[in-house]
Curated annotation (Swiss-Prot):
This is Adenylate kinase. Residues 30-59 are annotated as: NMP. NCBIfam families: adk (TIGR01351), PRK00279.2-1 (NF001383). Monomer. The gene is adk. Catalyzes the reversible transfer of the terminal phosphate group between ATP and AMP. Plays an important role in cellular energy homeostasis and in adenine nucleotide metabolism. Keywords: ATP-binding, Cytoplasm, Kinase, Metal-binding, Nucleotide biosynthesis, Nucleotide-binding, Transferase, Zinc. Its main location: cytoplasm. Residues 122-160 are annotated as: LID. Pfam families: ADK (PF00406), ADK_lid (PF05191). HAMAP family: Adenylate_kinase_Adk. It catalyses: AMP + ATP = 2 ADP. Consists of three domains, a large central CORE domain and two small peripheral domains, NMPbind and LID, which undergo movements during catalysis. The LID domain closes over the site of phosphoryl transfer upon ATP binding. Assembling and dissambling the active center during each catalytic cycle provides an effective means to prevent ATP hydrolysis. Some bacteria have evolved a zinc-coordinating structure that stabilizes the LID domain.
């Protein structure tokens, strides 16, 4: 099974990707996480990618496509995966279809701009285990202590400020809305209400994927 999660930054794709992947025992591939890992390296590629991220610009198709293709051609992904944040435009979708022939399901997370901004501005994660939190919606049960691993060290993303977030959302709309129209005609396109609670969204996705 190949599942694509589409939606703007802050729509909840990563949270649901991890949950659903665990339930159906498939890898969760998040393009955002992949590039954030690359940025932490001291390479010319990292510097180039970081410049796009800081300005709220999308990373060029040729860079994104090659990174994703290298990942997906690995044998560990031969049985399927959940792909989070890719493709983001028609050019990427057609590149993806050029080397992936299996049937896919596309799930789009529909969320208002106002809620997206609040979700992104408030989010942070445990530096040790990666558990995601939000200052507005999901704080640790004990202040400054991760619910999962007990660590007290958290990571706040430097690219998350309101001006950059608004630009990212607008860039996303320009790039991705034509892709949504393209996938709507595929017969395997589904929309979930991303404004619902985590649990409600998870249930909706399970119904789409026919997970018991």
């Amino acid at each position: 099974m190949i599942v694509i999660f589409l939606g703007p930054p802050g729509a909840g794709k990563g949270t649901q990707g991890k949950k659903i992947a665990k339930k159906i025992n498939l890898p969760h591939i998040a393009i955002g996480d992949i590039f954030r890992t690359i940025i932490k390296t001291s390479t010319s590629e990292a510097e180039l990618i970081n410049n796009y991220v800081k300005q709220g610009e999308l990373i060029p198709n040729e860079i994104v496509n090659q990174v994703i293709k290298n990942f997906l051609l690995s044998s560990e992904y031969k049985n399927g995966y959940i792909l989070d944040g890719y493709p983001r435009n028609l050019e990427q979708a057609k590149f993806f279809e050029s080397f992936i022939k299996e049937k896919i399901k596309i799930i789009y997370f529909d969320v208002s701009d106002e809620l997206l901004i609040k979700r992104i501005l408030g989010r942070y994660s445990c530096k040790n285990c990666g558990k995601i939190y939000n200052r507005y919606f999901l704080q640790p049960k004990t202040d400054n202590v991760c619910d999962v691993c007990g660590s007290s060290t958290f990571d706040y993303r430097k690219d998350d400020n309101e001006e950059v977030i608004k630009k990212r959302i607008e860039v996303y709309k320009t790039e991705t809305y034509p892709l949504i129209d393209y996938y709507k005609n595929s017969g395997n396109f589904y929309i979930v209400n991303g404004s619902k609670s985590e649990q409600e969204i998870e249930i909706d996705i399970q119904k789409i994927l026919k997970i018991n």
